[in-house]
Amino acid sequence: MTDWSRGSWTREPAAVALDAEGSLVVEAVEGSDWWRDTAYGFRHEDGHGLLAPWAPGAAVEVTFALEGFTGEFDQAGLVIVVDDATWIKAGVEQSDGHPQLGAVVTVGASDWSTGRVDDWTGRAVTVRASRIADAVVIRARSRPLDADAAASGEGDDWRLVRVARFPHEDARIGPMLCGPTRAGFRVRFLDWRETAPDGELHAPPPA
Protein backbone atom coordinates (compact mmCIF):
# COMPACT_ATOMS: atom_id res chain seq x y z
CA MET A 1 0.00 0.00 0.00
CA THR A 2 1.25 3.49 -0.85
CA ASP A 3 2.73 5.50 2.01
CA TRP A 4 1.13 8.88 1.33
CA SER A 5 2.45 10.24 4.65
CA ARG A 6 6.02 10.53 3.31
CA GLY A 7 5.13 13.78 1.52
CA SER A 8 4.09 17.23 2.68
CA TRP A 9 1.69 19.58 0.88
CA THR A 10 2.85 22.77 -0.80
CA ARG A 11 -0.67 24.03 -0.11
CA GLU A 12 -3.32 22.27 1.95
CA PRO A 13 -6.15 20.99 -0.28
CA ALA A 14 -9.82 21.62 0.45
CA ALA A 15 -10.15 17.99 1.56
CA VAL A 16 -8.01 14.84 1.75
CA ALA A 17 -9.17 11.30 2.58
CA LEU A 18 -8.12 7.67 2.15
CA ASP A 19 -10.71 5.39 0.56
CA ALA A 20 -11.24 1.70 1.32
CA GLU A 21 -8.68 0.65 -1.30
CA GLY A 22 -5.97 2.92 0.10
CA SER A 23 -6.24 5.50 -2.67
CA LEU A 24 -5.82 9.16 -1.72
CA VAL A 25 -8.86 11.25 -2.67
CA VAL A 26 -7.99 14.95 -2.81
CA GLU A 27 -10.18 18.00 -3.48
CA ALA A 28 -8.50 21.09 -4.92
CA VAL A 29 -9.10 24.61 -3.68
CA GLU A 30 -10.82 26.76 -6.32
CA GLY A 31 -8.25 28.92 -8.09
CA SER A 32 -5.25 26.70 -7.33
CA ASP A 33 -2.68 26.54 -10.13
CA TRP A 34 0.97 26.83 -11.17
CA TRP A 35 2.00 29.18 -14.00
CA ARG A 36 4.55 31.97 -14.48
CA ASP A 37 4.01 34.85 -16.88
CA THR A 38 4.16 33.43 -20.43
CA ALA A 39 1.24 34.40 -22.73
CA TYR A 40 -1.26 34.86 -19.88
CA GLY A 41 0.69 37.54 -18.02
CA PHE A 42 0.00 36.24 -14.51
CA ARG A 43 1.68 34.17 -11.84
CA HIS A 44 0.02 31.37 -9.90
CA GLU A 45 2.19 29.59 -7.36
CA ASP A 46 -0.44 27.91 -5.21
CA GLY A 47 -1.09 24.48 -6.74
CA HIS A 48 -1.36 21.38 -4.57
CA GLY A 49 1.75 19.19 -4.54
CA LEU A 50 2.38 16.33 -2.12
CA LEU A 51 6.17 16.41 -2.20
CA ALA A 52 9.10 14.38 -0.93
CA PRO A 53 12.82 14.65 -1.74
CA TRP A 54 13.70 13.12 -5.11
CA ALA A 55 16.55 10.62 -4.81
CA PRO A 56 18.88 11.13 -7.81
CA GLY A 57 19.04 7.40 -8.59
CA ALA A 58 15.30 6.77 -8.73
CA ALA A 59 12.42 7.35 -11.10
CA VAL A 60 9.08 8.45 -9.65
CA GLU A 61 5.65 7.37 -10.88
CA VAL A 62 2.27 8.85 -9.91
CA THR A 63 -0.96 7.11 -10.92
CA PHE A 64 -4.45 8.65 -10.79
CA ALA A 65 -7.94 7.96 -12.11
CA LEU A 66 -8.88 10.14 -15.09
CA GLU A 67 -12.48 10.74 -14.05
CA GLY A 68 -14.43 13.89 -13.20
CA PHE A 69 -12.23 16.25 -15.22
CA THR A 70 -15.03 18.58 -16.35
CA GLY A 71 -13.88 22.11 -15.51
CA GLU A 72 -11.57 24.12 -17.73
CA PHE A 73 -7.96 23.47 -16.66
CA ASP A 74 -8.82 20.72 -14.13
CA GLN A 75 -5.45 18.94 -13.88
CA ALA A 76 -3.56 16.17 -12.11
CA GLY A 77 -0.25 14.36 -12.39
CA LEU A 78 3.12 14.98 -10.81
CA VAL A 79 5.17 18.08 -10.05
CA ILE A 80 8.91 18.53 -9.58
CA VAL A 81 9.90 21.61 -7.56
CA VAL A 82 13.35 23.15 -7.17
CA ASP A 83 12.13 26.64 -6.15
CA ASP A 84 9.32 29.08 -6.98
CA ALA A 85 10.83 29.89 -10.38
CA THR A 86 12.09 26.41 -11.30
CA TRP A 87 9.62 23.55 -11.56
CA ILE A 88 7.97 21.06 -13.90
CA LYS A 89 4.41 19.78 -13.80
CA ALA A 90 3.19 16.96 -16.03
CA GLY A 91 -0.07 15.07 -16.37
CA VAL A 92 -3.53 15.49 -17.82
CA GLU A 93 -5.33 18.82 -18.00
CA GLN A 94 -8.85 19.49 -19.26
CA SER A 95 -8.47 22.20 -21.90
CA ASP A 96 -10.68 23.39 -24.77
CA GLY A 97 -13.14 20.59 -24.10
CA HIS A 98 -10.64 17.70 -24.13
CA PRO A 99 -8.32 15.92 -21.69
CA GLN A 100 -4.79 16.85 -22.75
CA LEU A 101 -1.57 15.08 -21.83
CA GLY A 102 1.25 17.54 -21.41
CA ALA A 103 3.93 19.24 -19.39
CA VAL A 104 4.76 22.74 -18.20
CA VAL A 105 8.48 23.44 -17.79
CA THR A 106 9.30 26.59 -15.84
CA VAL A 107 12.74 28.17 -15.63
CA GLY A 108 11.89 31.75 -14.74
CA ALA A 109 8.87 31.65 -17.08
CA SER A 110 6.57 28.79 -18.06
CA ASP A 111 6.07 26.97 -21.34
CA TRP A 112 3.43 24.35 -22.17
CA SER A 113 3.30 21.36 -24.50
CA THR A 114 0.11 19.34 -24.83
CA GLY A 115 -1.92 16.86 -26.90
CA ARG A 116 -5.35 15.24 -26.67
CA VAL A 117 -5.91 11.90 -24.92
CA ASP A 118 -9.70 11.54 -25.12
CA ASP A 119 -9.37 7.74 -25.18
CA TRP A 120 -7.76 7.80 -21.72
CA THR A 121 -10.95 9.03 -20.03
CA GLY A 122 -12.12 6.56 -17.39
CA ARG A 123 -8.71 4.89 -17.15
CA ALA A 124 -5.80 4.95 -14.72
CA VAL A 125 -3.04 7.28 -15.89
CA THR A 126 0.58 6.92 -14.76
CA VAL A 127 3.03 9.80 -15.16
CA ARG A 128 6.72 9.00 -14.76
CA ALA A 129 9.80 11.19 -14.27
CA SER A 130 13.38 9.94 -14.54
CA ARG A 131 16.74 11.67 -14.76
CA ILE A 132 19.09 10.93 -17.65
CA ALA A 133 22.39 12.85 -17.65
CA ASP A 134 21.47 16.58 -17.43
CA ALA A 135 17.81 16.02 -18.33
CA VAL A 136 14.51 14.86 -16.88
CA VAL A 137 12.46 12.51 -19.05
CA ILE A 138 8.68 12.57 -18.63
CA ARG A 139 6.62 9.60 -19.86
CA ALA A 140 3.00 8.57 -19.39
CA ARG A 141 0.67 5.67 -20.12
CA SER A 142 -2.85 4.51 -19.27
CA ARG A 143 -4.44 1.22 -18.22
CA PRO A 144 -7.93 0.05 -17.29
CA LEU A 145 -9.21 1.01 -13.87
CA ASP A 146 -10.72 -2.47 -13.48
CA ALA A 147 -8.52 -4.39 -11.05
CA ASP A 148 -8.63 -7.68 -12.98
CA ALA A 149 -7.68 -6.01 -16.25
CA ALA A 150 -4.90 -4.10 -14.54
CA ALA A 151 -3.53 -7.28 -12.97
CA SER A 152 -3.44 -8.95 -16.38
CA GLY A 153 -0.95 -6.34 -17.55
CA GLU A 154 -3.30 -4.82 -20.11
CA GLY A 155 -2.41 -1.21 -20.84
CA ASP A 156 -0.75 1.23 -23.19
CA ASP A 157 2.93 1.50 -24.00
CA TRP A 158 4.81 4.40 -22.44
CA ARG A 159 4.53 7.67 -24.36
CA LEU A 160 7.37 10.16 -24.31
CA VAL A 161 5.89 13.45 -23.09
CA ARG A 162 8.88 15.71 -22.60
CA VAL A 163 12.67 15.85 -22.37
CA ALA A 164 13.79 18.96 -20.47
CA ARG A 165 17.14 20.14 -19.21
CA PHE A 166 17.36 19.47 -15.48
CA PRO A 167 20.82 19.87 -13.92
CA HIS A 168 19.49 20.03 -10.35
CA GLU A 169 20.42 17.42 -7.74
CA ASP A 170 18.13 18.82 -5.05
CA ALA A 171 14.44 18.69 -5.91
CA ARG A 172 11.12 17.55 -4.47
CA ILE A 173 8.58 15.50 -6.38
CA GLY A 174 5.14 13.98 -5.94
CA PRO A 175 1.44 13.98 -6.85
CA MET A 176 -0.09 17.23 -8.10
CA LEU A 177 -3.56 18.63 -8.71
CA CYS A 178 -5.02 22.06 -9.44
CA GLY A 179 -8.53 23.42 -9.87
CA PRO A 180 -8.02 26.84 -11.47
CA THR A 181 -11.61 27.57 -12.46
CA ARG A 182 -13.97 25.79 -10.07
CA ALA A 183 -14.57 24.36 -6.64
CA GLY A 184 -15.21 20.68 -6.02
CA PHE A 185 -12.60 19.15 -8.34
CA ARG A 186 -11.49 15.83 -6.87
CA VAL A 187 -8.75 13.44 -7.91
CA ARG A 188 -8.31 9.84 -6.82
CA PHE A 189 -4.60 9.09 -6.64
CA LEU A 190 -4.01 5.35 -6.88
CA ASP A 191 -0.25 5.08 -6.41
CA TRP A 192 2.96 7.04 -5.82
CA ARG A 193 6.20 5.11 -6.00
CA GLU A 194 9.93 5.20 -6.56
CA THR A 195 11.23 2.72 -9.11
CA ALA A 196 14.27 1.97 -11.26
CA PRO A 197 15.38 4.87 -13.47
CA ASP A 198 15.35 4.88 -17.26
CA GLY A 199 18.38 3.21 -18.80
CA GLU A 200 18.30 5.31 -21.96
CA LEU A 201 16.07 7.82 -23.68
CA HIS A 202 14.99 5.79 -26.71
CA ALA A 203 14.08 2.59 -24.90
CA PRO A 204 11.15 1.62 -22.65
CA PRO A 205 11.65 2.09 -18.91
CA PRO A 206 12.47 -1.00 -16.84
CA ALA A 207 9.44 -3.21 -16.25
Where are the predicted features?
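Extracellular glycan-recognition regions
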Residues: 1-207
